[in-house]
Amino acid sequence: ADGVLNTDWGDCGHINHPDFSLVGMIYGAAFSWNTEIPVFDEINRQISRIAYGDVSETLVSVLAKISVSWKFTWRNAVDRLEQLREVPLYSMEVYRNAAEQLEEIKGELYASVSHLPVEQKKQIHAYLIALQGMILLQKLGMVLAGDQTSDETCSGQRCALAEELEYWLYDYKALWRSVSRESELFRIQHVICCYADWLRS
């Protein structure tokens, strides 16, 4: 039988905010019920307008770029920390380019706020926190892929990244607690704190 299985995986502490599931749920409904499924850009345009009230009709296309732009992922970070399997690394340049792409997307997301109705603007906050976390993971990937020297400059940069991760975790925990109970939050905190400690070691 033909059908659609629409899932929201909770691996590695389920780091994603619940709001991020909305577009996937709409995709699932459209693919299940529509006799003619719009092309990707068109369905994203429709969702932007109908679900978010985005008069520019571009928001969901911007969001769609996020998940394909990072190279050192949360799954990579968890697997490498827990040593469950070998995690191959890209070059420092690949991670640097990924961080730059994510910064550009963050700028587009900030710009998109002006096209949203007031009641929808607050939803962008969760995406901005997620993007910042992804950018920091690319910087972590650069450290892991780079020369592990302990000169003063490198040490200072590593300590600065550790501090950025901890500040990000503070914001992330506040966001988590605004919609969820503690649940798996301690696992996410453990991963971030372990890497922060490692960066300072």
Residue ranges and their predicted role:
Residues A1-S201:
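Substrate-binding groove of N-acetylhexosamine-processing glycoside hydrolases
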